[in-house]
């Protein structure tokens, strides 16, 4: 039996975030196009070289991107919206689609399945000419071959997943458009095969959640492609879950290899193989190392998996690989020497995961005795972290055991609470607010860096934060906002900030992963039991409230978002970790309330993204996710108004869950998705406070008052004005002051115009 090592994708951002810095330098005209392309090529080839040096045999080519791999595919296939037709150069068109411009609205951005990565949503328009506009995978394949002598494995997004992720067509049009994709995919694969590509990875993550009819439709497309490209060696790659429900049909697809996730879809995929076997004429690519988390693998467990598979699989070949692209993990743990030994030893970032693949390959080809020392080391590491005091806190266990049913609900129903809140808060019809953060200017970031490096004192840093807070309180008053925020100038990241102040968390120095475009985040590490230590937001929020007669919102990140945006310990269920976080936040919320804060926002932008891919698994997740939010927020008085915020979600799937959160007000991203949630509300009712975002904060353009008024007008057709709020899509941290102030002025004016119209029509 031939066994090879393979990788599905490598992190793009560079060990020191060189990729991010190059992008932003190009966008700000600090480097020209030639310099940009040269530097990007250097980064791209360096990533290939690292994988080569680590001993990976099938190295992914084409996973590298200037922004997003789905956007790459859209451009490659000619899915370019007509509003960008005035742009002529590749990069101008590409980045206009991704980011928008002064006069052009960007394409929508949303979450990549149930991860924290965002992709640009492809747009289909009537009359679109679908063709292979640019064979980028071929260029990159030839580049790696010529520059490094690497005969790589081209990676492309499959036609079915691509079109399922796209928007702009009716369901009736889907089959027709899908057939139109056959020709460009045939050309793409033919040219790669002709250039010498030995194996081509075709990613179809959507296959984990298809109906029987969709599977048959997908199979017909692959049969049409295979008919035209009979000799290309295709690896049909699935990930993020099992394909158990349709496995029997999948293994008959006309491809040479099938990649399955044996981490996040282990039970389902093993059940399917046990029941139906695996074709002897196909290669099984075994996703055995977790590509979405940062913990060392349990090598004994992985080797047991292969023992099981080798008994049930008749194929002559196997591929050892991660469960998915390593895009979702930091690059290398070697710089994290500040961590405790027990935690550092338990980690495995992308480069360490590549080393684990090679270890497994050695054990499978040379016997386990060839890695006996490494196996012993791994066993000791796992024993140490499992028995750690941080993972066995008696106070946390006692608090969990003591929970009662009444801890998960507010005393009064929403309608009665809202009446009391209106009396207490005295807000106008259609109140205006922002989502929480204001621009983190160069000065803010530089001052924080100086403080962290000990260049300025705690007192100097606190004075600076107070100065920024007061400045933006005054801005908000002048603009005319109704509910203000303190601006979050003390926070780098909405999750990292809390991780640094709760027991059970740790944080890395260089554990960056890509979120969207050049935006990178450094997820905290939940390694132990989570517990409250001291107040986390009290000082800044109370100070902001002391500066104004207007209401100031307390700002917290919710338990499910903290969970979903962290690297989470894998020794207990995620539900239990979420409840631990909720109990800690409950304490903080009670402190805010007792300090005089009457509106408290608990953001849950990641609630939807944590949902399992399969609908049959949704209810269990939604139940504990909602319970976590209720546990955090239900101990406040009826007069205290609880807000929450969500973004980047397919909300139609979770309207009932949103309702069950029982938040007094929810703000939701609306403008970037071109009013999608407004359409959802046409078919259901939402009888609580709601704010539908009136402008896209991810684009530098300042929308006009009329644009925002139009969204307000559309929203009021499906929302009760009595409960309607007006706000941006998301926080304003990444925008510049000169963009934020006029945009908020336009928003407030749109609100005033809407109020006037409502009064006139009353």
From Swiss-Prot:
GO biological process terms held by the UniProt record: methionine biosynthetic process; methylation
Cofactor requirement: Zn(2+)
Record InterPro entries: Cbl-indep_Met_Synth_N, Cobalamin-indep_Met_synthase, Met_Synth_C/arc, UROD/MetE-like_sf
Involved pathway(s): Amino-acid biosynthesis; L-methionine biosynthesis via de novo pathway; L-methionine from L-homocysteine (MetE route): step 1/1
Cofactor stoichiometry and binding remark: Binds 1 zinc ion per subunit.
Keyword Oxidoreductase attached: no
Enzyme class: transferase
EC number(s) per entry: 2.1.1.14
Binding annotation for L-homocysteine: 435-437, 488, 603
GO molecular function: 5-methyltetrahydropteroyltriglutamate-homocysteine S-methyltransferase activity; zinc ion binding
Keywords: Amino-acid biosynthesis, Metal-binding, Methionine biosynthesis, Methyltransferase, Repeat, Transferase, Zinc
SUPFAM superfamilies: UROD/MetE-like
Residues that bind L-methionine: 435-437, 488, 603
PANTHER family, per the entry: 5-METHYLTETRAHYDROPTEROYLTRIGLUTAMATE--HOMOCYSTEINE METHYLTRANSFERASE
NCBIfam families, alphabetized: met_syn_B12ind, PRK05222.1
Family per record: Belongs to the vitamin-B12 independent methionine synthase family.
Protein name in the entry: 5-methyltetrahydropteroyltriglutamate--homocysteine methyltransferase
Native source species: Bacillus thuringiensis subsp. konkukian (strain 97-27)
Classification lineage: Bacteria, Bacillati, Bacillota, Bacilli, Bacillales
């Amino acid at each position: 039996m031939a066994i090879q090592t393979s990788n599905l994708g490598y992190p793009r951002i560079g060990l020191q975030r060189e990729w991010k810095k190059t992008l932003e330098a190009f966008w700000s005209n600090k480097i020209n196009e030639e310099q940009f392309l040269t530097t990007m090529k250097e980064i791209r080839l360096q990533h290939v070289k690292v994988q080569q040096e680590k001993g990976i045999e099938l190295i992914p080519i084409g996973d590298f991107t200037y922004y997003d791999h789905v956007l790459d595919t859209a451009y490659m296939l000619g899915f370019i919206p007509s509003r960008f037709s005035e742009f002529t150069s590749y990069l101008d068109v590409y980045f206009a689609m991704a980011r928008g411009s002064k006069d052009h609205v960007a394409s929508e951005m949303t979450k990549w399945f149930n991860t924290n990565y965002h992709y640009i949503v492809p747009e289909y328009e009537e009359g679109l000419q679908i063709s292979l506009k640019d064979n980028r995978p071929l260029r990159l394949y030839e580049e790696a071959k010529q520059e490094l002598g690497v005969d790589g494995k081209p990676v492309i997004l499959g036609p079915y997943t691509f079109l399922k992720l796209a928007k702009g067509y009716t369901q009736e049009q889907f089959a027709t458009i899908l057939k139109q994709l056959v020709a460009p995919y045939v050309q793409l694969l033919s040219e790669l095969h002709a250039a010498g590509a030995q194996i081509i990875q075709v990613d179809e993550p959507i296959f984990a959640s298809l109906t029987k009819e969709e599977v048959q439709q997908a199979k017909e497309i692959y049969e049409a492609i295979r008919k035209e490209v009979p000799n290309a060696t295709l690896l049909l790659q699935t990930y993020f879950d099992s394909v158990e429900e349709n496995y029997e049909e999948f293994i008959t697809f006309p491809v040479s290899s099938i990649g399955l996730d044996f981490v996040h879809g282990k039970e389902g995929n093993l059940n399917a193989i046990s029941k139906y076997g695996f074709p002897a004429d196909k290669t099984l690519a075994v996703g055995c190392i977790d590509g979405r988390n940062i913990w060392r693998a349990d090598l004994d467990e992985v080797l047991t998996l292969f023992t099981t598979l080798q008994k049930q699989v008749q194929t002559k070949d196997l591929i050892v690989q991660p469960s998915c692209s390593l895009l979702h993990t930091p690059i290398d743990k070697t710089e994290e020497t500040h961590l405790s030994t027990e935690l550092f030893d338990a980690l495995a970032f992308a480069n360490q995961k590549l080393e684990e693949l090679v270890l497994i390959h050695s054990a499978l080809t040379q016997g386990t005795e060839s890695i006996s020392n490494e196996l012993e080391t791994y066993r000791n590491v796992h024993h140490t972290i499992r028995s750690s005091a941080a993972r066995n806190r008696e106070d946390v266990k006692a608090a969990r055991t003591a929970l009662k049913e009444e801890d998960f609900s507010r005393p009064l129903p929403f309608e009665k609470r809202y009446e009391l809140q209106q009396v207490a808060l005295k807000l106008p019809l259609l109140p205006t607010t922002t989502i929480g953060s204001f621009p983190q200017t160069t000065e803010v970031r530089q001052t924080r860096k100086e403080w962290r490096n000990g260049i300025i004192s705690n007192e100097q840093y606190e004075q600076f934060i107070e100065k920024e807070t007061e400045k933006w309180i005054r801005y908000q008053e002048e603009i005319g906002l109704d509910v203000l925020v303190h601006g979050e100038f003390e926070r780098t990241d909405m999750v990292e900030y809390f991780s640094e102040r709760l027991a059970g968390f740790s944080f890395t120095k260089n554990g960056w992963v890509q979120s969207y475009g050049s935006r990178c985040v450094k997820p905290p590490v939940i390694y132990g039991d989570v517990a409250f230590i001291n107040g986390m937001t009290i000082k800044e929020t109370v100070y902001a409230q002391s500066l104004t007669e207007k209401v100031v919102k307390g700002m917290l990140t919710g338990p499910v978002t903290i969970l979903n945006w962290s690297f989470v310990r894998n020794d207990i269920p995620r539900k239990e970790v979420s409840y631990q976080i909720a109990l800690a936040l409950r304490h903080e919320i009670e402190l805010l309330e007792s300090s005089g804060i009457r509106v408290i926002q608990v953001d849950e932008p990641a609630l939807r993204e944590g949902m399992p891919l399969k609908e049959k698994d949704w209810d269990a997740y939604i139940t504990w996710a909602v319970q976590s939010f209720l546990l955090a927020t239900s101990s406040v008085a009826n007069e205290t108004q609880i807000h929450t915020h969500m973004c980047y979600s397919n909300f139609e799937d979770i309207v009932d869950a949103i309702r069950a959160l029982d938040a007094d007000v929810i703000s939701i991203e609306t403008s970037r998705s071109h009013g999608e949630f407004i359409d959802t509300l046409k078919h259901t009712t939402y009888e609580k406070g709601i704010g539908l975002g009136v402008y896209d904060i991810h684009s530098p353009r300042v929308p006009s008052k009329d644009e925002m008024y139009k969204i307000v007008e559309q929203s009021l057709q499906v929302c009760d004005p009595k409960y309607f709020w007006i706000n941006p899509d998301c926080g304003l941290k990444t925008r510049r002051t000169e963009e934020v102030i006029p945009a908020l002025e336009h928003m407030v004016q749109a609100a005033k115009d809407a109020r006037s119209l409502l009064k006139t029509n009353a």
